[in-house]
Amino acid sequence: MKKILFPTDFSPAATNAFIHALEFAKIVQGELILLHTFDLPIYDNQYFPENYNVIFDSLQLSQFDAFKDEIPKLRAIAEEQNLDKIKMSHRLMDGDLIYNIKKVIKEDKIDFVVMGTAGETGWGTFFLGTNTGSVINAIDVPMLSVPLEAKFKKIKTIGFTTRYRTKDKKALKEVITIAKKMNAQVRCLYVKTSTSDVSETTIKKWDTEFAKEPVIFSVIPSDEIKETIIDFILFKEIDLLVMLAYKRNFFVELFKPSLTEKFANTSSIPILALREKKSRNFEEVAAG
């Protein structure tokens, strides 16, 4: 059974992402591990309280009580979605969020991470350094990131951007694995700029290789890469965008609200970020 880590602070963004996590667990036949972390108080050594252990125990107990109170609410959500059969376990940990996420991934052999994100600029804050954005750069497993505005709906069309590189082909195969489980179609976009070095022969080879797969290739000539990708998301009605998480700066530019007025409509799209260097092969992870 695949293991899906779901870090939560019980915020509206996290609660919204929880539904996506449940549905994703259903698709990959997985179980959810809910993680909640809390920070310990920081004291200067000069003023370190003698009763620190008492303070720690009190804080830990209050966090446990709060955590315990939230669990029934999540189970109620699972029941409402008819997904209460999904296996769930819980972990409460003190300390740094990213450190604990990496620790759980290693200890529990996590296959996927699902997190919610929120902010005035939607995906802009995600890629500019929120907890979610920091996590995506720190882990080596696929991560589904869900903005607050992204209410769950059946995924019919998955968008994937490519530059026709070998690493892109491997990633596309991984995306197709997931698409088949969702009974979804993959729309693969290549923005061909005036300086493109991708040959027509390469493009045709990909067309031939994936001819029997649920994927449609689109080659759009343009030097406005980011605008073209956003138009693609909108006009092809993309429900989930999949990208290799190797160029964070590109993500930042792509989802800047100032880039286009159309951003408001694209900021509600979940993003599945694949790492180039993964601890395990994604196809093996996704296969059920």
Language-model features: where?
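Short, structured interface segments
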Residues: 132-150
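Short beta-strand elements of ligand-binding domains
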Residues: 116-117, 142-148, 271-275
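Structural beta-alpha unit
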Residues: 72-113, 210-261, 269, 276-288
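Short glycine-rich, flexible loops that bind phosphorylated cofactors or substrates
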Residues: 13, 121-122, 167, 249-251
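Helix-enriched interaction subdomains in cytosolic or periplasmic regions
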Residues: 112-138
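A short acidic, glycine-rich active-site loop
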Residues: 53-66
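Small/aliphatic-rich secondary-structure junction motif
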Residues: 1-54, 157-219, 238-240, 266, ...
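Charged helix-capping and loop-helix junction motifs
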Residues: 128-131, 202-204, 255-260
